[in-house]
């Protein structure tokens, strides 16, 4: 398996700046006045009850939701080329097998690496050619997560990545996220599961956003 690329020390440390971000949905305020700065090598955990706006916030960050007020600024004009976004749904094509799904996703995002090794890393060795329609929800989630074992992007935005994976999968994902951050990747994810110590936490509740655990507002 090829080694994931690391990021040059010459690149700016700041990856993302949000200033006074606000969003409503169905005439209900999700969050207001959200401001924070996220930098290379940081892990940000976004928490909140169902409906608090976690997924909406991630979709704003990656450019899939345009109905908001405030400023969202990434570190470079071509930021989308250096972004890996995994949504709440696995995004797997049922008619394709895991290997075909992974190759298809990599072609769309211009992501390199060894798909066979990535599938083995997430416990899908031996299932590479089984149609996704015949796999469990957890196995489909692992197909999506396998992209985290390919050539590394500068930013990972992950919506509930721990859904439908077993204890071994959780441990492997924890390790991969921590290693990515150590190599300079900014990781932003939604989950009630905390990856480890030093994680910056953003909690959404009652239209407000609170940054804790060392997050800079």
Curated annotation (Swiss-Prot):
Keywords, comma-separated and alphabetical: ATP-binding, Cell inner membrane, Cell membrane, Cytochrome c-type biogenesis, Membrane, Nucleotide-binding, Translocase, Transport
Q: Where does ATP bind?
A: 48-55
Q: What EC number is given for this enzyme?
A: 7.6.2.5
Question: What's any one GO cellular component for it?
Answer: plasma membrane
PROSITE patterns xref list: ABC_TRANSPORTER_1 (PS00211), ABC_TRANSPORTER_2 (PS50893), CCMA (PS51243)
- Cell compartment(s), UniProt: Cell inner membrane
**What are the GO MF terms of this UniProt record?**
ABC-type heme transporter activity; ATP binding; ATP hydrolysis activity
One of the Pfam families matching this protein, by short name: ABC_tran
- GO BP term, example: cytochrome complex assembly
Q: How does it sit in the membrane?
A: Peripheral membrane protein
InterPro entries the UniProt entry points to: AAA+_ATPase, ABC_transporter-like_ATP-bd, ABC_transporter-like_CS, ABC_transptr_haem_export_CcmA, P-loop_NTPase
From the UniProt record, list the reaction(s) this protein catalyses.
heme b(in) + ATP + H2O = heme b(out) + ADP + phosphate + H(+)
Residue ranges occupied by any ABC transporter domain in the UniProt entry = 16-214
Q: What does this protein do?
A: Part of the ABC transporter complex CcmAB involved in the biogenesis of c-type cytochromes; once thought to export heme, this seems not to be the case, but its exact role is uncertain. Responsible for energy coupling to the transport system.
What family does the database annotate? Belongs to the ABC transporter superfamily. CcmA exporter (TC 3.A.1.107) family.
User: PANTHER family, per this entry?
Assistant: ABC TRANSPORTER I FAMILY MEMBER 1
Q: How does it assemble?
A: The complex is composed of two ATP-binding proteins (CcmA) and two transmembrane proteins (CcmB).
- The name on file for this protein is Cytochrome c biogenesis ATP-binding export protein CcmA
Source organism per entry reads Alcanivorax borkumensis (strain ATCC 700651 / DSM 11573 / NCIMB 13689 / SK2)
Traced from the root, the source organism's taxonomic lineage reads: Bacteria, Pseudomonadati, Pseudomonadota, Gammaproteobacteria, Oceanospirillales
Write the gene name. ccmA
């Amino acid at each position: 398996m090829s080694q994931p690329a690391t990021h040059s020390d010459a690149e700016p440390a700041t990856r993302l700046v949000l200033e006074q971000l606000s969003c409503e949905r169905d005439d209900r305020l999700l969050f207001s006045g959200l401001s924070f700065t996220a930098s290379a090598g940081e892990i940000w955990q976004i928490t909140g009850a169902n409906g608090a706006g976690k997924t909406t916030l991630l979709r704003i960050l990656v450019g899939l939701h345009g109905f908001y007020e405030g400023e969202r600024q990434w570190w470079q004009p071509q930021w989308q080329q250096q972004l890996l976004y995994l949504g709440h749904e696995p995004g797997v094509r049922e008619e394709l097998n895991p290997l075909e799904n992974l190759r298809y996703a990599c072609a769309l995002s211009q992501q390199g690496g060894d798909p066979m090794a990535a599938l083995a890393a997430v416990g899908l060795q031996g299932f590479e050619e089984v149609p996704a329609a015949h796999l469990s929800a957890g196995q489909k989630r692992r197909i999506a997560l396998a992209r985290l074992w390919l050539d590394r992007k500068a930013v990972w935005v992950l919506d509930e990545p721990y859904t439908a994976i077993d204890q071994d999968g959780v441990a492997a994902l924890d390790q991969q996220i921590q290693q990515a951050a150590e190599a300079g990747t900014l990781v932003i994810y939604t989950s009630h599961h905390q990856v480890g110590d030093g994680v910056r936490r953003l909690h959404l509740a009652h239209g407000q956003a609170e940054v804790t655990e060392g997050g800079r507002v």
